[in-house]
A protein has these predicted regions:
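Pyridoxal 5′-phosphate
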Residues: 1-304
Length: 304
């Protein structure tokens, strides 16, 4: 909806989810991240042109878990908006964030974030599948996605999914209510899992910003080990891991996120994305660590 409602330049990053990247079109500037997956506000500022109408940056990266400085990016956009107003320039500029990955772990209050538009995915917070949300500042003139009966403010006509909407609202209320305690719990489990793996394999590489990342995410690489083989070996043991985003698990290509942060091909090909959730506990994390260590040792022996 946002992209189809503007006709100007877009600024985004090279590590956005494919759902965003593949919809951006050609009139776009993609900002490169740091090696930790951070998007610098100064780079966003440098990428903005007189015809830029939209900046879209995910609140947190879906693979690395790195949390972006969205409030600082929002200040960059507000400063540009003020400059245009004072100069008599009429081109609007808006900030959108895909907060799907961060809901339940990050404060997504739109006023505090300073965004003009925000999207969420119910499935990411244990809500109904295939239900999404777009919050949008009223000053943005959106073009309809589906025309017809005028439901959902005329933007997406058709009979509303009432049950899905209610389920989404309840799920969002629950995850926000337990956000702080769940973050603390997941962070302890994640760190426990990370410590077990890095103690067993000191040469392993943990990617992402260690100080600013989602409590649920651990991205770790084992250079020289075929991660695809690990995935299949671990699945047989009941341990579900991924080599990249779940949506791209069967693409057979190297992660564009890992390429963007400059991770060496050998390390990228040995990367696992481990995510924790409501059902994770200390016992299951310890068991998962044991199985991962055993699988890597099996692969090392095979390659010796």
């Amino acid at each position: 909806l946002m992209i189809n409602s503007i006709d100007g330049h877009i600024v985004s990053s090279t590590i956005e989810h494919d759902a965003v990247l593949k919809a951006l079109g050609d009139n776009v500037t993609l900002v490169a991240p740091s090696k930790k997956g951070n998007i610098a506000p100064r780079d966003i500022q440098a990428a903005i042109r007189p015809d830029t109408q939209l900046v879209t940056i995910a609140i947190a990266n879906h693979e690395l878990g790195t949390i972006q400085p969205l409030r600082d990016i929002a200040e960059v956009v507000r400063t540009e908006r003020r400059r245009r107003f004072e100069a008599g320039e009429l081109t609007p500029i808006y900030l959108h964030t895909d907060a799907s990955q961060g809901a339940g772990q990050i404060d997504i209050n739109v006023a505090r974030l300073g965004v003009d538009a925000l999207t969420l995915n119910a499935g990411k917070i244990y809500g109904p599948k295939q239900v999404g949300l777009l919050w949008c500042n009223r000053m943005i003139r959106l073009q309809p996605l589906v025309r017809g009966g005028g439901q959902e403010r005329g933007l997406r006509s058709g009979t509303e999914n009432v049950a899905g909407t209610i389920g989404f609202a309840v799920a969002l209320e629950l995850v926000q209510q337990h956000r702080n305690s769940e973050n603390k719990r997941l962070r302890q489990l994640r760190d426990q899992l990370q410590n077990q793996l890095t103690e067993a394999f000191p040469w392993a590489i943990v990617s992402g910003d260690q100080k600013r990342r989602l409590a649920s995410h651990l991205h770790i690489s084992f250079p020289g080990i075929d991660a695809e083989r690990l995935v299949f070996m671990l699945e047989r043991k009941g341990v579900l891991v991924a080599t990249g985003s779940a949506c791209a698990a069967n693409s057979g290509t190297r992660s564009h996120v890992l390429e963007a942060i400059g991770l060496a091909p050998e390390a990228a090909d040995g990367s696992l994305r481990l995510t924790l959730g409501r059902l994770s506990d200390s016992e299951t994390c310890m068991a998962a660590a044991r199985e991962i260590i055993a699988a890597i040792n099996t692969e090392k022996a095979r390659l010796a």
